[in-house]
Amino acid sequence: MSEVKINETENNFTLATAISNAVERAETGDNFMTEIVYNSFENTDKAQSAVYNAMMGGTCKPGDIIGEEVEIIGITITTGQCNTIFGDTSENPEKIIKPCVTFFLSDGRTVSTLSNGLVRAVKLMFACDNIPTEDAPFKCTFEQRTGKNGVFHTLKAL
């Protein structure tokens, strides 16, 4: 597993490296680790508290802002290890901890979600080099779609 690089002049995490690591851990089920990805957030106690509070529960849910045009200025990803509970599998099935994505919006709201559709949308966003910052926000709408397994959320770029 590669390490997160720190830009020593600004004391900020390199966003692309941190995201790559988080996605790799989400896909492989590597050890539990939370990374706070700083792009334009300052590395201060106040900024760290804001990120922590957002990751503990966003100010709104994806379903609350369906169809609304928003600007994403930052993203954090928290990943977990896939754990198997030993014993009778009928009573103790394999438990998987899903990655949590937190979106920071330009209007100050935060959206935290475990949605597979939004995790997939973030992977595609980064694959297309759309890395949101305050200077270059990712303009999109949150959408709700129906698939073969029911309703899911995703992002539509504007």
Please name every model-derived segment.
Residues 65, 121-141:
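Short nucleic-acid-contacting surface segments enriched for D/E, G, S/T with interspersed K/R
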Residues 137-151:
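A short, charged
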Residues 101-130:
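Acidic, glycine-rich flexible loop segments
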Residues 2-105, 147-158:
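OB-fold ssDNA-binding interfaces and closely related basic DNA-contact patches used
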